[in-house]
Amino acid sequence: MPKQQKKILITIDDGFESFYKEAWPYLKKNKIPFIIFISTKPVGKNGYMTWDQIKEIEKEDFVLIGHHSHTHDYLIDKTIEEFINDTEKASRIFLKNIGYVPSIYSYPFGECSKEMKDYITRNFDLSFGQHSGVIDVNKDKFELPRF
């Protein structure tokens, strides 16, 4: 694909069961690449995907699982220690259930403090906020925009 050709990236948050029932069959059939950001606390609860469903989609080579915290709380209101504890708890749960910790992070509600970003920068390969914009080589890879 020529470099100047425009590309898109599909990102999905939260791991809702409706994604698995409605969107997953289409994405799978057409092998459309995407990242799904999972918060670990709601997994298996009413309205959310189970770990078996997450493992099913994760095995496809066009799917990336992303880290989206444990609680999906509005973490910008938490202390840095609470943020780190929440993130590390999710990391342990990911390791137990899918065998690795995702290297891509999405801030719940798209916001982060400087301290949160510093922590994510040290522990992940890149991260997404939730502000509009295009991604190019000049973007900060730890505050990538998306709609």
Mark where each language-model region is.
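C-terminal active-site subregion of NodB/CE4 polysaccharide deacetylases
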Residues: M1-T11, E17-K21, K55-E56, E60, ...
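Generic enzyme active-site microenvironment
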Residues: T11-I12, G66
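Acidic (Asp/Glu)-rich catalytic clusters
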Residues: W24-I32, M49-H67, T121
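Short histidine/acidic/glycine/proline-rich micro-motifs that form metal-
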Residues: T40-G44, Y74, P108-E111
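Short, well-ordered secondary-structure micro-motifs
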Residues: N46-Y48, I76-K78
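Histidine-centered divalent metal-coordination motifs
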Residues: H68, H72
